[in-house]
């Protein structure tokens, strides 16, 4: 459910970017390399680039969903159950697309599954972080291409003439934090042999909140 909710949120952002791409396709802006003006471009191209980036990000999310949408029921502590379970039936009843056929792998795959999902979340966060950076930069007096609304900016306690892009700066920081998630999970599960270990419990602390953080 969490993965699907993220996918729906990404799809909504994608459609916003596509609409803006069409709306501003004839509005010129400089194209930059090395932060120096290089060639003519347009805001339509800029919006469209982020829309296409999200399409690629969704491929990672779809792959991660496919890998974790497998029924582990029947693996018990990792070595099978003495109960006569019909694993095919439980897979159908629980709505899984497939099952973990090897009971040891069903348990041993913990950490790997979370890392795959975390990598997909991190790629989405990377796209949004870059978008937020551009918004901050283009809003500055040195560029002045966009004017952020008042509810996305704050003033300064000692410099009242300023409009600081706090919302986009916080978005950038939170997305950069999310990009560290795969590494955190990898290091928690690093050097663990097969079998269950309490180390895996710590993954939940960093993994589960990430969905809401990205949706926010």
Language model regions located:
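Internal glycine-rich alpha/beta core junctions
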Residues: 40-191, 208, 212
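Long, non-coiled-coil amphipathic alpha-helical linker/lever segments
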Residues: 1-39, 98-113, 192-200
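C-terminal catalytic subdomain
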Residues: 178, 197-216
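Short, charged, low-complexity loops and linkers
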Residues: 1-6, 158-168, 197-205
């Amino acid at each position: 459910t969490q993965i699907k909710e993220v996918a729906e949120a990404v799809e909504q952002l994608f459609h916003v970017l596509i609409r803006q791409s069409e709306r501003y396709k004839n509005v010129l802006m400089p194209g930059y390399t090395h932060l120096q003006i290089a060639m003519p471009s347009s805001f339509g191209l800029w919006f469209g680039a982020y829309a296409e980036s999200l399409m690629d990000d969704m491929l990672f999310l779809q792959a991660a969903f496919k890998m974790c949408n497998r029924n582990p029921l029947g693996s018990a502590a990792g070595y099978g159950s003495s109960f006569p379970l019909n694993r095919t039936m439980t897979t159908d009843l629980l709505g899984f697309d497939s099952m973990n056929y090897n009971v040891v792998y069903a348990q041993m795959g913990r950490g790997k599954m979370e890392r795959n999902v975390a990598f997909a979340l991190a790629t989405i966060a990377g796209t949004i972080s870059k978008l937020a950076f551009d918004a901050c930069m283009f809003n500055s007096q040195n560029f002045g291409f966009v004017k952020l609304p008042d509810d996305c900016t704050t003033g300064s306690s000692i410099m009242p003439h300023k409009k600081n892009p706090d919302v986009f700066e916080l978005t950038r920081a939170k997305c950069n934090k999310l990009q560290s998630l795969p590494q955190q999970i990898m290091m928690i599960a690093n050097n663990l042999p097969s079998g269950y270990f309490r180390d895996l419990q710590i993954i939940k602390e960093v993994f589960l909140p990430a969905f809401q953080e990205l949706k926010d």
